[in-house]
Regions:
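Short low-complexity stretches enriched in small and charged residues
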Residues: 2-11, 36-39, 67-71, 91-98
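A short acidic, often aromatic-flanked loop/helix-cap motif at beta-alpha or helix-coil junctions
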Residues: 1-3, 38, 59-62, 143-149
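Catalytic core of membrane glycerolipid acyltransferases/transacylases, capturing the structured
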Residues: 3-59
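N-terminal start-of-chain detector that recognizes signal peptides
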Residues: 1-4, 24-26, 52-54, 84-85, ...
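Non-catalytic C-terminal accessory region of glycerolipid acyltransferases
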Residues: 63-173
Length: 173
């Protein structure tokens, strides 16, 4: 992993990664939809980690906020965590990767650390019930962003994550 602050690009399957990434990586700020901050207790806890909260209905404005605030957080020494699918997906069925995180990387020159996991197998989305088992987390090599366009960075990180996901168990045994 890079020594300097980086942008973590990861698939999003459950609440598990939002909790456990805090134990794996240095101080982080998450990109999230603004209305998550309005949830009593949960949202207040999220706010303590200096997230980048966006209004997803205003895409151009959201991208401007992400780049501006992302640069600030990186300058403060915080790592950014971005789930480019934009929402939780089912194991074995990753969603379309949006390029916001790659755009921040391209404009700041910060490295991207791709991360793949299968947390949704044991912590299904929209379910209070959790299942026992071992969640696999694979941290990829840093993708340098200097002199690269966002599209290339996005393709590299998405390709790496999708390749890993094909090798991880997508259902409980």
């Amino acid at each position: 992993m890079p020594k300097e602050p980086a942008i973590i690009i990861a698939n999003h399957q459950s609440a598990w990664e939002t909790l456990c990434f805090q134990l794996i990586f240095p101080a982080q700020s998450y990109l999230l939809k603004r209305n998550l901050l309005w949830i009593p207790f949960f949202g207040w806890g999220l706010a303590m980690n200096r997230p980048i909260a966006i209004d997803r209905s205003k895409k151009t404005r959201a991208l401007d906020v992400l780049v501006k605030e992302g640069r600030k957080r990186l300058d403060e020494g915080r790592w950014l965590v971005i789930f480019p699918e934009g929402t939780r997906t089912d194991p074995g069925a990753p969603g379309k990767f949006q390029a916001g995180g790659a755009m921040v990387a391209s404009r700041t020159g910060s490295p991207v650390v791709p991360v793949a996991h299968n947390a949704g197998v044991f912590w299904p989305k929209n379910s209070f019930l959790k299942h026992p088992g071992t969640i696999d987390v694979v941290i990829g090599p840093a993708i340098e962003s200097t002199d690269k366009k966002a599209r290339q960075i996005n393709q590299e990180s998405e390709g790496w994550i999708r390749g890993c996901l094909q090798k991880l168990p997508a259902q409980r045994k």
